[in-house]
């Protein structure tokens, strides 16, 4: 009788341990992510951050003009990184792994055409002038 009880208890313990492995991974309500987004100026910054923040579940978004990195805090229970990236490409900015449609890119302000090297160089020249004025 003791052997039967022992075997039955061992079976239950083994079964319950296996059931715990099957549980779904908990989603983080304050996940931090960062990735690269193409853009060149303050207007791009506002557009990129607004697109990210309008995504349900995004709590914080800030994009750096110099590094092109966006830092986001999101609730993974409400949204995904893929959704955020799609929303940013929908306003005309390329994200690593996703390219904005031509229609979306054409909708950005003429000074924000980050795919045009002349405009990018013009912005870089403006940044240098601003730095010299501050000194």
Regions found by a protein language model. Name each.
Residues 1-25:
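Bacterial Sec-dependent N-terminal signal peptides
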Residues 18-36, 82, 96-135:
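Sec-dependent signal peptide cleavage junction
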Residues 23-27, 44-45, 59-62:
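Short amphipathic alpha-helical segments, especially helix-boundary/capping motifs
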Residues 35-52, 110-114:
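Short, thiol/selenol-centered motifs that function as redox-active sites or metal-ligating centers
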Residues 48-64:
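Short acidic amphipathic segments
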Residues 60-106:
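Mid-chain, structured segments of secreted extracytoplasmic proteins
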């Amino acid at each position: 009788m003791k052997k039967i009880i022992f075997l039955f208890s061992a079976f239950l313990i083994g079964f319950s341990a296996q059931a715990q492995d099957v549980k779904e991974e908990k989603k983080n309500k304050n996940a931090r992510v960062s990735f690269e987004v193409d853009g060149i100026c303050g207007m791009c910054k506002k557009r990129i951050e607004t697109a990210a923040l309008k995504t349900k579940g995004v709590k914080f978004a800030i994009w750096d003009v110099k590094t092109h990195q966006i830092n986001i805090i999101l609730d993974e229970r409400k949204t995904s990184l893929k959704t955020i990236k799609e929303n940013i490409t929908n306003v005309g900015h390329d994200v690593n792994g996703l390219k904005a449609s031509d229609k979306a890119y054409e909708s950005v302000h003429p000074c924000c055409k980050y795919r045009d090297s002349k405009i990018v160089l013009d912005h870089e020249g403006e940044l240098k002038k601003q730095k010299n004025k501050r000194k």
